[in-house]
Amino acid sequence: KKGKMMVNETVREDVMDVILLVDAREVSAVGGGKDTPLEMSCRAAATYAKQLLDERNNVALMIYGESIERVDLDRGEHHLFKILTALSSAKPQGNLKLEIVLKDLLPYIPSGSPLILFSSLDDDHTISEAFTNTISRGYTITTVSPSSLDFEERMKRIPAQPLLIARIERDNLISEIRSFGMQVGDWKSDEAVNTALQGG
């Protein structure tokens, strides 16, 4: 009997509080239709939420754009439904910066909780600052980043030269985040989400 109790305690200790952050700013609508960074982020967040909840973790979802929509930490099948409902109604609007979002949220997030950010990392000059502030408080952030540049290239709206410069800037930003010791998946629109993180 004592042995059994120990097993349960070990399992209990392995349960994590995981925070999913989805970038739904206006800039996440590049591409149109089912293929936008926001659509990709929502699909990926749904996949992660299901997997984490299946493993009996507590999961919270924060969608930020014009404001922050929160689905607080919980677990179970009913909670997955709440998360999926919030993701399916996410609209690309507003331009809340990551640093402000995290400043608002961190006081409510249990310390040491892993954060998973789904964002194209576009058009946000606060990203480096947001990461360093968050990491210095003992949190880890894994980033799954659908590249909006793939969509731009397909739509041929941006000339080759500016597109190349944008790619270099994106690569530099990703390298900088990785230099903080954080994992970033540079997610191409034609690959599965788990491939992105293996590459990162």
Regions from the PLM with identified roles:
Residues 75-113:
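Von Willebrand factor
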Residues 103-115, 121-200:
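Von Willebrand factor type A / integrin I
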